[in-house]
A protein has these predicted regions:
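A short acidic, often aromatic-flanked loop/helix-cap motif at beta-alpha or helix-coil junctions
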Residues: 19, 116-119, 189-195
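Alpha-helix N-cap/loop-to-helix initiation residues
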Residues: 18, 75, 137-140, 164, ...
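Segments forming oxygen-rich coordination pockets for charged ligands
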Residues: 1-111, 125-129, 207-248
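Phosphate-bearing ligand-interacting subdomains
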Residues: 111-173, 201, 209
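Short, flexible segments with low predicted structural confidence
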Residues: 50-54, 118-119, 175-176
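Alpha-helix N-cap/helix-start motif
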Residues: 100-103, 140, 164, 197
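Residue-level recognition of short, well-ordered coil/turn positions
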Residues: 33, 87, 151-152, 176
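Adenosine-phosphate binding glycine-rich loop
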Residues: 152, 158-248
């Protein structure tokens, strides 16, 4: 198949592949777990990394998820941009009126924070990015401490270099090591010193997406497997996944 760039690719279509393998792949991704599929030289699919001679193994990982804890225009702008970009976004807000605004903007998951001592249960996974967008010492310390004990691949906090240094010092005084606090990015964003909420949102989201791509990047490969299936009762958001391969 010729490409507009002047190159070409070969395409192999498997029209009647095993639906059970595709469904198992979907279910595992929907539960935020990575999954591998092996394609044998005969064209059959198998779940998992199978050491079959001549087979190719493809790995699929969960999509990026973003959790934002904060208040004000910065939080809302980032959540709105991330949602428009197709990123599953959770917004944790202290202000009930802002929570209503977020729901009107179409943010899928909005939680109202009550007191620092009663945070929502942490459900971050290795493909979750967490951003702190609040300037309150008690909330900062508690929210960052919670994020640090979790597996989020990205932890960031809005604020200046001086503010970031003070945050890390406070966390170290309550028992976190320097190595642990080094996980926190600050100041956040690919472009420094953004002042308005919209520009800051673009800068921060770009940094998060870059960090996610670095985490999931595979070695360059000449082969990719795209899963495109039409199965009843399976949300479209998980029907299409693609991945590069390694030799099984």
């Amino acid at each position: 198949m010729p490409l507009p760039c002047g190159g070409a690719i070969d395409v192999c279509v498997l029209p009647n592949t095993q639906a059970s393998v595709l469904r198992a792949c979907h279910d595992q991704l929907a539960s935020r777990q990575p999954v591998s599929i092996t394609l044998s030289d005969s064209g059959s699919l198998g779940l998992g990394h199978l050491p079959t001679p001549g087979a190719l193994s493809f790995q699929y990982i969960p999509k990026l998820r973003l959790r934002i804890a904060g208040r004000g225009a910065d939080s809302l702008a980032l959540a709105r941009l991330a949602t428009a970009s197709g990123i599953h976004t959770e917004l944790q807000l202290r202000d009930a009126a802002e929570a209503q605004d977020a729901q009107r903007l179409g943010i899928e998951r909005v939680t109202t924070l009550t007191v620092p001592s009663a945070l929502p249960k942490l459900d971050d996974d290795p493909w979750t990015a967490f951003l702190l967008a609040v300037h309150d010492v008690d909330w900062e310390e508690t929210l960052l401490a919670q994020a640090l004990i979790g597996p989020a691949f990205y932890i960031g906090a809005i604020g200046s270099k001086a503010t970031h240094a003070r945050r890390c010092e406070r966390l170290q005084t309550i028992g976190f090591t320097k190595r642990q606090t080094h996980r926190i990015r600050g100041p956040v964003g690919l472009i420094p010193s953004m002042r308005d909420a919209s520009s800051l949102a673009v800068s921060v989201l770009a940094e998060i997406v870059e960090a996610y791509q670095r985490k999931v990047r595979y070695p360059l490969s000449s082969t990719a497997l795209a899963l495109l299936a039409d199965m009843p009762n399976v949300p479209d958001t998980h029907l299409f996944q693609s991945s590069s391969c390694t030799n099984a």
